[in-house]
């Protein structure tokens, strides 16, 4: 259980640092991209800087790159590019969340397991002749129940942070989808219409 608590604490700290709003979806990033692409498509250096800036930047850069690479890109294809880039970004944002959820689920079970083993030991150590001390038995049971309490002490915060981080990722996902939706018509102005 000590290992579970150390891993859970490390994951919580890592996710708190990684899921900051400024690092994932900066507030003015979409407006900056629209401003930069108002008259023409940016150079590859600018697009690379955009992609390196944040998860939202990676998604927006994927759309800009696709229009630069294929000027006859259809709106449907551009939306597919944004969708694929969004999936990759969301997958990165969800990193370690399943591990944190597993710890939240497993910690109380490990505590319960420790309690059961402790109870077996306590009752197994009692004299079969009936000369057992009730106070000693009660003390042994209370010590065994500490395992369950420790499991819950790990599980409750881990579950709360898991839910918090899940909500953050869901919020960032919506933000990225909305930004991509706003950028699609803007980028389609640069797409060359194919003559059929």
Region annotations inferred by a language model:
Residues 1-6, 97-103, 107-110, 114, ...:
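Small-residue packing motifs within transmembrane alpha-helices
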Residues 8-9, 45, 60, 111, ...:
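Residue-level signature of catalytic and energy-coupling elements of molecular machines
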Residues 11-18, 121, 160-163:
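Short hydrophobic alpha-helical membrane-anchoring segments
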Residues 17, 91, 135:
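Flexible, active-site-adjacent loop/turn segments at secondary-structure boundaries
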Residues 24-113, 117-131, 164-196:
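Predominantly long cytosolic amphipathic alpha-helical stalk/bundle segments
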Residues 135-162, 166:
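Pore-lining and gate-forming transmembrane alpha-helices of multi-pass membrane transport proteins
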């Amino acid at each position: 259980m000590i290992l579970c608590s150390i891993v859970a604490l490390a994951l919580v700290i890592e996710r708190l640092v990684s899921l900051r709003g400024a690092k994932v979806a900066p507030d003015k990033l979409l407006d900056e991209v629209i401003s930069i692409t108002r008259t023409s498509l940016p150079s590859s250096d600018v697009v690379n800087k955009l992609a390196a800036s944040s998860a939202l930047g990676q998604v927006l850069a994927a759309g800009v790159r696709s229009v630069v690479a294929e000027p006859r890109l259809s709106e449907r294809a551009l939306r597919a590019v944004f969708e694929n880039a969004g999936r990759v970004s969301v997958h990165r944002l969800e990193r370690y969340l399943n591990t944190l959820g597993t710890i939240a689920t497993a910690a109380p079970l490990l505590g319960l397991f420790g309690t059961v083993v402790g109870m077996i030991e306590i009752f197994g150590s009692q004299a079969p002749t009936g000369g057992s001390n009730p106070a000693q038995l009660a003390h042994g049971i209370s010590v065994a129940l500490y395992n369950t309490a420790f499991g819950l002490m790990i599980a409750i915060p881990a579950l709360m942070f898991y839910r918090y981080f899940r909500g953050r990722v869901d919020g960032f996902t919506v933000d990225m989808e909305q930004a991509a939706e706003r950028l699609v018509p803007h980028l389609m102005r640069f797409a060359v219409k194919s003559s059929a």
